[in-house]
Each structure stands twice: as structure tokens, then as C-alpha cells.
Regions:
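HTH-adjacent hinge/linker in prokaryotic transcriptional regulators
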Residues: 3, 30-33, 69-151, 163-170, ...
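Conserved phosphate- and dinucleotide-binding cores of soluble alpha/beta proteins
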Residues: 8-9, 16-18, 28-43, 48-56, ...
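Generic hydrophobic alpha-helical segments
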Residues: 42, 131, 135-139, 161, ...
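Glycine-rich beta-strand-to-loop/alpha-helix junction loops that act as flexible
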Residues: 112, 151-157, 312
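A general structural motif
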Residues: 145-149, 169-171, 238, 304, ...
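Short Gly/Thr/Asp-enriched flexible loops that form oxyanion-binding sites at enzyme active sites
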Residues: 157-168, 253-261
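Catalytic or ion-translocation cores adjacent to nucleophile or general acid/base/metal-coordination motifs
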Residues: 173-181
Length: 346
């Protein structure tokens, strides 16, 4: 089985041909003859839109021979990527497609397998390295351009993924979706995760210097602060979001200290995104003080064009299903075992 993809280009590559080197030029210097924008256009027409070389030539005002050279050059520069997939990975793709259909998502990206309980290393020890390639692929497919806004949530999974290489997306504005936490664990610090993600993709970090749950007296002042308003103002502009999904609060070994786990309302919660809890139907589950929470609303997630959730584990099955059906995200990065567990749910 063979898969082919045409990779998007950055805006810096999107420039017209110089007047001295028209599309039909026979110059042997492909770097001066064919811009990456032109190569991308030719490849997009031929591979994605299934136009013939003659049709591409007509659309670009050039010859078939030139189109053939363009397609070869597009492959050489990595604009067109062809992957030969062995039968095992083909089955992997079938699992991803079945999960995508079940959850009604746009895309599902499956990672390699995570360790079983019988193996020496725990899931958390290798989670980042296993999930990072699939997450990088999802981010690369988000179509982000310089100046676009990418939001990131807190959480152990996103934090672990942020330790590894991701696809460069230079010029993207990266911003947190929830205020800070006074707990020492790094995965509760969204500014730290924002910094890590920005460094990995070559983005521009925007930090939110506010607690996730300020007191009643501090909340009105904070939300009027210009520096905080600037970051909150990025939320409605988001083109994409990378988010973790929390397990049911009553089953978690650790949870933000501001969450009152003794609150009766949280008994209905199956999970959370950006510290916003929800039940099996995706309805918001409030708790005492949650009206002061400085965090992205669940309803706002539905308006973000590309919502990438990264989650693994049996305890994440229910929140993944509820979150997907509520359209809180439209893409999922997970492992094969979690995918099979979700498919087993009636």
C-alpha cells in the first residue's frame, strides 16, 4: 500500500515567478525557475485534484514536459511525500478510520503501542516519545501560517509530548488556555508548556500571568488588566488548539488544588478540557468558584477550526467519547489500545 501527501508551504515561499523566468522556461536551474509556490500548485493539481499533466500544463500556461519536471522537483524538495506502508501499518490505518467514523472526527492519528503493565517501563515514562510523532503530524496538517494562533492546554500528556521534536511552524502565536497553578508539577504550568511548544515549532509564546482560579476580590481586577486581556483576546482568534483530556476527577491521583473534589457536582463529571469539567453528555459541570475560572470555555472549543486532542488510557475512554460527540475537538491523537477500547464501547 502506498500513501502520498502534498505538504503545505509557508507564506514566505508563496511568491510569484520572476518575470525573467517564466513557467515554461527550459532553464536547468530549478531553484531560479520554479518557486516552491509554483511546485506546490502543480503538485496539488496533479496529486490531490487528480488533474492530468496536460490539464496542469494548461492551467499553469506551460508545457507537459515542464509539468513533469515540476512534479519531480516537488518530490525532491519534499513538497510531495510518498510513503510505502507495510501490511501491519495498513491495518493500523483501518483502526484509525473506524475510530474516526465512530467518533465523528475529521482525523485520527494513531501512535505506536505504549508499554503494557507487564513491561518494565510505565506508560508515563515513554508517553511523550511515542505520541510526539503522531502529534507532530497532526500539527503539520493544521495548515497554520505565520501569525495564526495556536492554543495549548495544560496536562501531563501535552507536557510530555512537548519534550520531543515537533514539526516547525515558524511565526505561529502560541498561547495558554488556562491560568497558572501553584502546584510544583510542570504539567500544571501552562506558561511552561507554552514555552516548550513554542521552542519546538519556532513559534512566538504569549504568557498568561494570572492564576487559574483567583479569589473573588482579585478576579475583577485581573480580567481588566491589559496584559491579561491581550492573551485572552487571542482565544477567539485561534486557528488550532492542542489539548489534553483529563480523566474523571474522582478517579485521579492528582488534580489542580483549586478543584474541590468533595463537591457533589463533580460526581457527574467524566473528564475535563482546560480545567472545564463535563458529563457523559458533554454538558458543563460547574463547581463552587468555577465562575471565576480563567480558562477557555468548552463552548469556545467548538468554534476553533482545528481541535487536536491527545489522550491515552482506559480512564480517558469516557471523556474522549463525550468530548468528541460534543465537538470539543475534531482530531484525536491516541494509541492503538485506547482506540480499541473506545471501539468496544456500545
Amino acid at each position: 500500500m502506498r500513501y502520498l501527501s502534498v505538504m503545505p508551504i509557508s507564506s514566505s515561499d508563496a511568491m510569484p515567478l520572476p518575470a525573467s523566468t517564466p513557467a515554461g522556461s527550459t532553464s536547468t536551474s530549478t531553484n531560479s525557475t520554479f518557486t516552491r509556490a509554483l511546485l506546490y500548485t502543480a503538485a496539488k493539481l496533479y496529486y490531490d485534484e487528480e488533474a492530468t499533466q496536460a490539464e496542469v500544463a494548461k492551467a499553469l500556461g506551460t508545457s507537459r514536459a515542464t509539468v513533469s519536471r515540476m512534479l519531480s522537483e516537488a518530490r525532491r524538495q519534499g513538497i510531495v511525500r510518498i510513503q510505502v506502508v507495510p501490511p501491519q501499518e495498513e491495518a493500523h490505518g483501518s483502526l484509525a478510520e473506524r475510530l474516526r467514523v465512530k467518533l465523528g472526527l475529521h482525523r485520527v492519528y494513531l501512535s505506536g503501542p505504549l508499554p503494557t503493565p507487564a513491561q518494565q517501563k510505565g506508560t508515563v515514562d515513554v508517553m511523550g516519545s511515542v505520541l510526539a510523532p503522531a502529534t507532530a503530524e497532526a500539527l503539520a496538517g493544521a495548515g497554520l501560517m505565520p501569525g495564526d494562533v495556536l492554543l495549548v492546554s495544560s496536562g501531563r500528556t501535552v507536557y510530555e509530548v512537548a519534550q520531543y521534536d515537533l514539526t516547525p511552524i515558524p511565526g505561529v502565536l502560541v498561547a495558554p488556555t488556562v491560568g497558572g497553578n501553584d502546584q510544583p508539577e510542570e504539567w500544571y504550568q501552562t506558561n511552561e508548556i507554552t514555552r516548550l511548544i513554542s521552542n519546538k515549532i519556532g513559534g512566538r509564546p504569549n504568557y498568561l500571568f494570572a492564576p487559574a482560579l483567583p479569589g473573588p476580590d482579585l478576579y475583577p481586577t485581573l480580567t481588566k488588566d491589559p496584559a491579561i486581556q491581550r492573551v485572552l483576546g487571542l482565544w477567539p482568534q485561534a486557528r488550532a488548539i492542542l489539548m489534553g483530556i483529563g480523566a474523571p476527577p474522582l478517579l485521579r491521583a492528582d488534580i489542580p488544588q483549586f478543584v474541590p473534589i468533595t463537591s457533589s457536582s463533580l460526581r457527574e463529571a467524566v473528564g475535563d478540557i482546560c480545567s472545564r469539567f463535563y458529563d457523559r453528555d458533554g454538558n458543563t459541570v460547574d463547581f463552587p468558584g468555577s465562575e471565576r475560572l480563567i480558562a477557555l470555555e468548552l463552548s469556545a472549543l467548538q468554534d476553533i477550526p482545528v481541535g487536536i486532542a491527545v489522550a491515552v488510557g482506559a480512564e480517558k475512554v469516557a471523556p474522549i467519547i463525550a468530548g468528541a460527540r460534543s465537538r470539543y475537538f475534531n482530531q484525536l491523537v491516541t494509541d492503538p489500545t485506547t482506540a480499541q477500547q473506545i471501539l468496544a464501547v456500545e
